[in-house]
Amino acid sequence: MSIRYESVEKLSEMIKNKEIKPSEVVKDIYDAIEETDPTIKSFLALDKENAMKKAEELDELQAKDQMEGKLFGIPMGIKDNIITEGLETTCASKMLEGFVPIYESTVMNKLHDENAVLIGKLNMDEFAMGGSTETSYYKKTVNPFDHTAVPGGSSGGSAAAVAAGLVPFSLGSDTGGSIRQPAAYCGIVGMKPTYGRVSRFGLVAFASSLDQIGPLTRNVKDNAIVLETIVGEDKHDSTSAPVADNDFTSDIGKDIRGMKIALPKEYLGEGVNDEVKEAVRNAVEILEGEGAIVEEVSLPNTGYGIPSYYVIASSEASSNLSRFDGIRYGFHSKEANTLDELYKLSRSEGFGKEVKRRILLGTFALSSGYYDAYYKKSQKVRTLIRQDFERVFEDYDVVVGPTTPTPAFNLGEEINDPLTMYANDLLTTPVNLAGLPGISIPCGQTNDRPIGLQFIGKPFDEKTLYRVAYQFEQQYNLHDQYQNL
């Protein structure tokens, strides 16, 4: 197996044992990108010169036995809505084409402190609005398992690059499923941490009460290792939580005998296809075989998650994206003759169709006369959804179900049908609305397209999610299939 498919844990071991130099790892990754990414189209920008320079500096530290950092010499890819100082950050939008940040995001500072090596920026749905990575202004990423299928979204580039062996880990952002859904479609592991667990400073805002940064990897333990490096309270983000326990790996490998797991009947109901239901039922049998107690429960407000989410997220987006006016930064229309025209033309030309749709929806929901009927009512529904989870977690440790109602759909199949596209978020949006942690791991395949299993945990209990996900992974994984993609 090529180095490109090795895990974060294995690469770290090889580097620390001096079996390989960081520069050799990074070169192998760029060779893989050159060979594979013209087809996959996961990267928007590469930072090869700086990456090789840093890797060679790490070679020198390796020679001196000064290998500090949990991710020493490990290559990484970063979703293009996470600010990277000195490297173009576009959010896959014409609006930010050519924008080079002059400061660093908190997560990037943390990863640099761990001596990880930035390979490049990854494709996404424009401003993280979409579920297929087809709304990107620049290119359409494909699914490494089936090039006629979407990789999911909005972190489609982040998921595809990891599945294709182009980076051992990546970061994405999850507002309504944007890490977990592409992880499910691409057969990898994706974690949306508890809201506030990871600083959002330097994440270009979509919906500020929902957005969270998280890792995507090819196995569960790697995911826990990466998450440990990026969590923590941040003075630059007032919503970051002062939680002391940032250890996610110590329970990995412990059995799950006696663990109580809830399976909501709504998660296997209308809209979920038969192959997905069968894969989840098989997964439940595996969990029971490991000694877990799985029981059916009800989360009665699940069906209201999508309408509630799209009102709240679009309302927050209409506010957050008002800063892109063509004056201070962002696309500047050359056709405008007046200030009013400058605002209108810069935004209408700079934003894509889906972004404009959500800005319009959010502006309408917040407008006088409709605020109570839409936005306020959606916030009440959000409270009911959170209370549903609270009731279940009084008696259960974890909730399990499918990540998505179906496997990956075909490229071009749903891009012009927004309601069908939004329906794919049925099982992921409630987790964001409740601010809970959720992880997606592979649990099956149909017609070569992976199916994802989602575990949902109590607030700030990512450790338990990793424990149960790891135990399941030992019985079912796609590790040997990645190299055949």
UniProtKB/Swiss-Prot annotation:
Broad class of enzyme this protein falls into: ligase
EC number: 6.3.5.7
Catalytic reactions of this protein: L-glutamyl-tRNA(Gln) + L-glutamine + ATP + H2O = L-glutaminyl-tRNA(Gln) + L-glutamate + ADP + phosphate + H(+)
SUPFAM superfamilies: Amidase signature (AS) enzymes
InterPro entries associated with the record: Amidase (IPR000120), Amidase_CS (IPR020556), Amidase_dom (IPR023631), AS_sf (IPR036928), GatA (IPR004412)
GO molecular-function term, one example from the UniProt record: ATP binding
GO BP, sorted A to Z: translation
Gene Ontology cellular component terms for the protein in this record: glutamyl-tRNA(Gln) amidotransferase complex
Annotated catalytic residues: 79 (charge relay system), 154 (charge relay system), 178 (acyl-ester intermediate)
Keyword annotations of the record: ATP-binding, Ligase, Nucleotide-binding, Protein biosynthesis
Function statement: Allows the formation of correctly charged Gln-tRNA(Gln) through the transamidation of misacylated Glu-tRNA(Gln) in organisms which lack glutaminyl-tRNA synthetase. The reaction takes place in the presence of glutamine and ATP through an activated gamma-phospho-Glu-tRNA(Gln).
Subunit field text: Heterotrimer of A, B and C subunits.
Family membership: Belongs to the amidase family. GatA subfamily.
PANTHER family: GLUTAMYL-TRNA(GLN) AMIDOTRANSFERASE SUBUNIT A, TRANSAMIDASE
Protein name: Glutamyl-tRNA(Gln) amidotransferase subunit A
Lineage, highest ranks first: Bacteria, Bacillati, Bacillota, Bacilli, Bacillales
